[in-house]
A protein has these predicted regions:
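Conserved polar/disulfide-associated segments of primarily extracytoplasmic proteins
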Residues: 6-148
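Start-of-domain marker
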Residues: 1-5
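Long, compositionally biased interface segments
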Residues: 136-173
Length: 173
């Protein structure tokens, strides 16, 4: 189900456009979400770059370099005011849907102006896939230790990543 889009300037640094899709139950409780996000630094910030090569894992997806991060998330935590997460949650709230309290998420990023795959660029296509964690029988606290993912998360990560990669298809024109 397509819930809508938003276009905004993020932190006076970049132009963002996001589109949100969900799979939900009859009570509008989200089971899965698909967040497609385009972001470009503003011309007034010519030196700024997105940095993925230092933190995220590199992979070849859809014929190009992509940067991957998986993590558990607590939807009950308030997003930073003005953040892209706040815009994402506002789309969901306005459409009358509810996020589960605990999610498993995958962020897949392609830097559109980084043909060499360095992890540094000014324009990105970001795709975020999320699933309700409840069907696993685990909680955020069970898959993290001192704020870092643990062996329980590692067991969930590979199948989650495969579902996320298969959820999106990217074709260049």
């Amino acid at each position: 189900m397509y819930l809508g889009a938003d276009r905004f300037i993020l932190k006076e640094l970049s132009d963002c456009e996001m589109h949100v899709f969900v799979e939900a139950d009859a009570n509008r409780n989200i089971r899965r979400f698909y967040w497609v996000h385009f972001e470009s630094y503003l011309p007034s910030k010519p030196e700024d770059r997105m940095t993925y090569g230092d933190i995220d894992r590199r992979a070849n997806l859809w014929g190009a370099t992509a940067w991957i991060r998986t993590e558990p998330a607590q939807s009950s935590r308030a997003p930073r005011p003005g953040s892209d997460t706040e815009h994402f949650r506002n789309i969901i709230r306005r459409a009358g849907y509810a996020m589960p309290p605990r999610m498993m998420t995958v962020r897949l990023v392609r830097l559109l102006d980084d043909p060499k795959g360095t992890g540094y660029g000014r324009r990105e296509l970001m795709m975020i896939y999320g699933e309700d964690m409840a069907p696993t029988g685990l909680t955020y606290e069970a898959v993290t230790t001192n704020g870092k993912t643990n062996a329980r998360w590692a067991a969930l990560e590979k199948p989650l990543l495969n579902r996320a990669i298969n959820a999106f298809h990217v074709n260049e024109r």
